[in-house]
Amino acid sequence: MSLLSKFKNDPLFAKVMRSSGSLFSNNTLALGLSVVQGIMATRLLGPAGFGLIGVVMAFASTVNSIFSFRMSELVVRYGGEYLNKQDKEQASALFKAASTTEAAVSLLAFLVVLFTAQFAEIYLAKTPDIAWMFTFFAINLLANFNIETSTGVLQITEKIKLQGAVNLIQAIVTTLIIAGAFFFGGSIIVILVAYLIGRSILGLGLFILAQNQLKEKLGSGWWRTPLSKLTARKEIFRFAFSSNISATIIKLFRESELIWVGFFLDTTAVGYYRVAYTITHFLAIPADPLIATTFPEINKLAVEKAWGKLKSFLKKITAFSFAYNIAIGAGLILFGQWVIQIYSGKEYLAAYPALVALTIGLVFNYILFWNRPLLLALGLPEFPVYVTLAAGIIKLALSFWLVPVYGVAAAGGLLSFYYIASVGMMVLRGIVEIKRKEER
């Protein structure tokens, strides 16, 4: 049997590809619109203005992640198991706990942004009289009060493709507003409003879709189920706490790059880095649908203790992701300067060294995109915490020395180091654990 036949005849791989393909098609259209948004916003605002918007948006997201419990992972891990066992009572209690906790965290995050906006203005944006922007954009945290739980529900009910439809709608609305600002001389405020409306549409849209799925699967009164019906409260709390710590570490060391660049340099440098970061994250477009659709399948195989099938599945999705990530990565490195000029103009060519550095680490990360979901499915939620913390501390320590001297290229290189070190260790740990369980 040929390699291609093995892929085509694997029903699990085919199922994941179908679900990912549906989500990918909508996300591809949304990506095209986000490119158009970037083309207009970079030219309208210039590097400093584009960087300022990036810092404002990243600050709200980072504060939220510090308190976030990554409810989508908890919902997939335990909600998926309960639904598979037709244990609707425990599933209802879990979804209720996840929803209320996430809503409380979103409110807390908004209040933290409100009280720290002045600090962000002085030390991160380094631009006078813009503290209100941080508070204004943080309204999206309230609109996204249940986005993680909703995403998890759509994953385990196999309706994740609907996320792509909502994402496309918000991309269309955001693009139309930015286009109006671009052609009619709008200000940075209009751009900020556009992104706020887009984020709000995504959060509220997913919430409505998830509620419909919960009513269909559990009945209209699912939310009345008392939390006391959860029997594995200690285990669930351990998972949620570990996910919270892991999410905080990941956000501080990996996904808050614009904030750190703003802290070490200025908003112009943030503008350059944001362009490089945005372009290289085109790699995430095919990867994100795969992550969303493979985690539930990995979790199912782990629950069933089907270790042979799990290894075969991981090999297939890794081979698939290797092929397209290497191709896209090589294209970004070879034609990166040309891509930057098309996306944002010659004014942003200083972003190219950072683009090259970031591409290397992101290609490695997205080839092995299943690293953390595998450990969660294997019951090892703490291991990613230790690894990401160690790699993150080293990265941050080196940043104080290298970024002020070598600029955005050093920032990109250090993030790549973080990806390679942390992802590599998590993959090795997952493989070792599968072998250990097979030998039992």
Can you say where each PLM-predicted feature lies in the sequence?
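Interhelical loop/hinge segments that connect adjacent transmembrane helices in multipass membrane
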Residues: 1-16, 188-192, 206-254, 297, ...
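Interfacial segments at transmembrane-helix termini and the short loops linking adjacent helices
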Residues: 9-16, 117-137, 267, 308, ...
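Signature of the first transmembrane helix
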Residues: 14-77, 110-117, 140, 238-268, ...
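Membrane-water interface segments that mark the loop-to-transmembrane alpha-helix transition
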Residues: 19-30, 68-118, 306-329
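Interfacial/gating helices of multi-pass transporter permease domains
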Residues: 41-62, 131, 189-193, 231-243, ...
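Helix-loop junctions and terminal segments of transmembrane helices
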Residues: 69-85, 155-156, 219, 276, ...
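Hydrophobic alpha-helical transmembrane segments
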Residues: 131, 135, 165-221, 390-394, ...
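Membrane-interface junctions at transmembrane-helix termini in multi-pass inner-membrane proteins
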Residues: 142-169, 189, 360-387
